[in-house]
From Swiss-Prot:
The keyword Ion transport applies. Pfam families: ATP-synt_DE (PF00401), ATP-synt_DE_N (PF02823). The gene is atpC. PANTHER family: ATP SYNTHASE DELTA/EPSILON CHAIN, ATP SYNTHASE EPSILON CHAIN, CHLOROPLASTIC. It comes from Thioalkalivibrio sulfidiphilus (strain HL-EbGR7). This is ATP synthase epsilon chain. Keywords: ATP synthesis, Cell inner membrane, Cell membrane, CF(1), Hydrogen ion transport, Ion transport, Membrane, Transport. F-type ATPases have 2 components, CF(1) - the catalytic core - and CF(0) - the membrane proton channel. CF(1) has five subunits: alpha(3), beta(3), gamma(1), delta(1), epsilon(1). CF(0) has three main subunits: a, b and c. One of its GO terms (cellular component) is plasma membrane.
Amino acid sequence: MAMTFHVDIVSAEESIYSGTAQMVVAPAEGGEVGILPRHSQYIAQLKPGEVRVKVSDSGEEHSIFISGGLLEVQPHVVTVLADTAVRAKDLDEAEAKEAMRRAEEALSDRKADFDYAKAQAELIEAAARLRMIEKLRRHTR
């Protein structure tokens, strides 16, 4: 039997996943990180993207989109504190495209009270959602 550890993925709205895993892969600011059992203590800021939780040797895996957050790793527990989190199967492509359109429009139509950083962050998040939707589409064919 493979070694496992406990994983919690939570957002302000709800707990998305709580259970055991063999591996977690998350989009840290410095690059994608893979966490295995007995990993040394680690904390990282997360960027928008996919968190993958490998549950078993059979290949069962959960994919969760996060808009950013924090990753805390202890030897036997991994916690993802996400700004927002959505199960991959629940992502809405039309909503993501609309969010991207609005962010691109805001970036091109700057006004005096324009918040460039916010518009850029919204664009990055929308693009990450669309990449994840496209990845899911390729894997379900």
